[in-house]
Amino acid sequence: MRVIRSLLLLTIAIIGSVLSQSSIDDGYTVFYSQPDNYYVKPGTFSNGVAQAIFSNEMMTTGWSFMSISSSEGLYPNDIIAAGAGYLEGYISQEMIYQNWMNMYNNEYHNVIGSDVENWIQENLQYLQTMIDSAPSNDLYWQNVETVLTQITYMQRGYNQSVIDNGVDASQSLGITEFFLMNMDGDMIDLGPALNLTNGKQVTSPATATSPKQAFKEFMRRTGHCSALIKMTDDLSDLFSGHTTWSSYYEMVRMFKVYNLKYLFNGQPPASKVTMFSGYPGTLSSIDDFYLLDTKIVVIETTNGLMNNNLYHLITSESVLSWIRVIVANRLATGGESWCQTFSLYNSGTYNNQWIIVDYNKFIKGYGALDGTLYILEQVPDYVEYGDQTAILRTGYWPSFNIPFYENIYGLTGFNETYAQFGNWFSYQASPRSMIFKRDANNIHSLTQFQAMLRYNNWQNDPFSQGNAGNQISSRFDLVTADDPNNQYLDPDAFGGIDSKVVSADMVAALLVNAQSGPSHDNETPFTWNSQWNQKYTYAGQPTTWNFDWMTMSLQSMKPASPSSDSSSDSTTFN
């Protein structure tokens, strides 16, 4: 075990939350010189390896924005990946450090276990062996190699920024820290697996001795999220949306656009542009929410494992979820091919329900063709997926952290937790399932869809059972600890931390509407008050979260325009 500069870094992190910049720049360019040198200059220059637009508007919008594009036809894949990573690490060093310190202090309690470090090294050795032994024209491993190159050089650019900008050397980070930021979702399952391997006691929802302990473990293992795919009754539109559930200390947010002009075997990948809600220092969303230029939307919510029966199947000789989703996004031409690619080299970590919406197969006024909606669910050593467009044609597809496929439901231990604790663990009758059944088919516009994804009206909604955590965008900070009816939930700075939505027209135009922070449509905006600011580090965040919707495009973010039909909308559910 190693303890890393805890008290000093905690102090710096808190100071950083006050000093964090709120500026919009005119762009940056990264240049390459032989044999392996990269340097960053302000401004955008077409002869560089890659160009970036970056703004940190956390204090005014709840978001930062990063758009990185590579120059076309000038450099090979390894230099494009290295340059893009170096550039991002260099210009967003402050925010990466804030994100890491919030995670390090709150999640790892200032200690990284040697078992985690060793597993990462074993996994990297496996990946390098597979890359080296794969045929030179193997698309999968070529793409994995670019991902590893990008993160390696992100760390290098980050540390060079620390040096060049006179930042305290204690802020330098190793490759382990960068991998842990990207593995945040995978650690939900890898952490318990390593603990069991080391002979430690691991409580699961299935072995809990009380409903409250069971639900606490359930939330820890399935902390992400709510999602909804909604086809309007007149078949004129198809909405896709996602609300991330997470600890509030993780609200240092960065919406990202990658437009990296790779050529694999002389051809570009199916998808060249990826837009996603993410975090400083991460190459994947982790939420997850992606809009691709192939007109495919990729979303997930976490199912998790309710028992410990499958953790022994997790091995370092696999590809972690955060890498597999990047590769699948690039190579997929539709829902089925996405599922086929993602299923390869299953790590058994971050066991999610993946929702793949192919807008190429949605026809306005006609509806959804077969293949519009694919659903994939994963557990260690097993993946199941299929075309679920028929369900979408009934009006909507909901997702709320409970498995859809019967085999997955059984393998993950939900049968046992349902038998013991009832409808909290029921696909058909859990609180969010019932809310979607009641309200989803009352959505007719984008404004209403946004309101649904941000929905929290726990005081008046009977399905909340008097609890602010039982809503589409939960607010566990509002849970009343001494409520005699509350046998399940404890108050915590945890809940829905954002929402992202698209319509058919927005997908075609590569636009995303996004709102950051806990839901405040019907509730008081969340504030880091004395109840929470002494319990958690929240470097880089505003004190109060009261922000509106933003529209993200390829090169900017701006306040979202009111929907043209908003005047006639009724956005009150329940």
UniProtKB/Swiss-Prot annotation:
Keywords: Glycoprotein, Hydrolase, Lipid degradation, Lipid metabolism, Secreted, Signal. Its main location: secreted. It is an enzyme of class 3 (hydrolase). GO terms for molecular function: phospholipase activity. Pfam families: Phospholip_B. One of its GO terms (biological process) is phosphatidylinositol catabolic process. GO terms for cellular component: extracellular region. Gene3D superfamilies: 3.60.60.30. Disulfide bonds: none annotated. It is found in: Secreted. Glycans are attached at residues 159, 195, 415. InterPro entries: PLipase_B-like. Its EC number is 3.1.1.-. Residues 1-20 form the signal peptide. Belongs to the phospholipase B-like family. Phospholipase that removes both fatty-acid chains from phosphatidylcholine and produces the water-soluble glycerophosphorylcholine. In addition to phosphatidylcholine deacylation, it also hydrolyzes phosphatidylinositol and phosphatidylethanolamine. This is Phospholipase B-like protein A. It comes from Dictyostelium discoideum.
